[in-house]
UniProtKB/Swiss-Prot annotation:
Places the protein is found: Vacuole
CC terms in the record's Gene Ontology section: vacuole
Major localisation: other
Signal peptide range in chain numbering: 1-18
Lineage, broadest ranks: Eukaryota, Fungi, Dikarya, Ascomycota, Pezizomycotina
The FAS1 domain, residue ranges: 77-225
Species, as recorded: Neurospora crassa (strain ATCC 24698 / 74-OR23-1A / CBS 708.71 / DSM 1257 / FGSC 987)
Disordered: region residues: 50-74
InterPro entries found in the cross-reference section: FAS1_dom_sf, Mug57-like
Taxonomic superkingdom: Eukaryota
SUPFAM superfamilies, A to Z: FAS1 domain
Name of the protein described by the UniProt record: FAS1 domain-containing protein NCU02579
Keywords: Signal, Vacuole
């Protein structure tokens, strides 16, 4: 299975989208139960309307699917796009990634190796703000910064920056090698301390290497990179 990119359409689809998937207002187990009980609607969906009292909601355009191959590595035809939905512990980030066209296409490209730094669901849920929110937007535009068509576009750009900050454009990625993420912000590297990989800057612990396939690896993180 390959990732299918999703783009924002008219606001009339917001209700259907809100019923399908709102990752930061629902638990990961709720998302998984729904993804098992119904097929993902492949129509392109816009940002959801904000829920009262909870701030703007702009989840990705479909629930991540945990239906990758049983064997995540070894086969020359298996891509990162095949395995991103396998691990339920990172399905929030997988959903964000598949909602952005360019990053999702990259994971389906055998010519572009990538190390995916995928934060745990719990790390994303514990953020002080949602991944598509930027305090600078609120400062400049107020509480309605993510309302309307312009707001949806603004949130989508912020979410893309968040996702791309977690994509390293190389694999294998040697210890100590400094490289800019796909998003092009400050250089990132990793080092091993007491047998544990840690992403720098930020000293973010790597829980494990979840998958290793022909065009890269998925590293599961206990924390989230700062995409600002």
């Amino acid at each position: 299975m390959r990732f299918t990119p999703y783009l924002v359409l008219a606001p009339t689809a917001a209700v259907a989208f809100a019923q399908l998937f709102d990752p930061l207002h629902r638990t990961a187990s709720d998302i998984q139960q729904q993804s098992q009980s119904q097929s993902v609607n492949h129509a392109q969906i816009p940002l959801a309307k904000p829920a009262v009292g909870l701030g703007p909601a702009m989840p990705p355009s479909g629930a991540p699917q945990a239906d990758g191959p049983a064997n995540a590595g070894g086969g020359s035809s298996v891509m990162l796009s095949d395995v991103m939905g396998r691990d339920k512990s990172i399905n929030l980030f997988a959903g964000f990634l598949r909602s952005i066209e360019s990053p999702s296409q990259r994971l389906d490209d055998p010519a572009r190796n990538t190390t995916v730094l995928a934060p745990l669901n719990s790390a994303i849920e514990n953020l002080p703000r949602k991944p598509w929110e930027d305090p600078r937007d609120y400062s400049a535009l107020g509480a309605n910064a993510y309302e309307g068509e312009d707001g949806q576009g603004r949130a989508q750009r912020n979410l893309r920056r968040f996702v791309e900050a977690h994509l390293i454009p190389t694999s294998p990625w040697p210890a100590g090698e400094k490289i800019k993420p796909v998003g092009g912000d400050t250089e990132v590297w990793w080092e091993e301390k007491d047998g544990v990989k840690r992403i720098q800057p930020g000293d973010i612990e790597v829980l494990n290497v979840g998958s290793s396939v022909v065009n890269g690896e998925v590293w599961i993180l206990k924390g989230v990179r700062n995409a600002s």
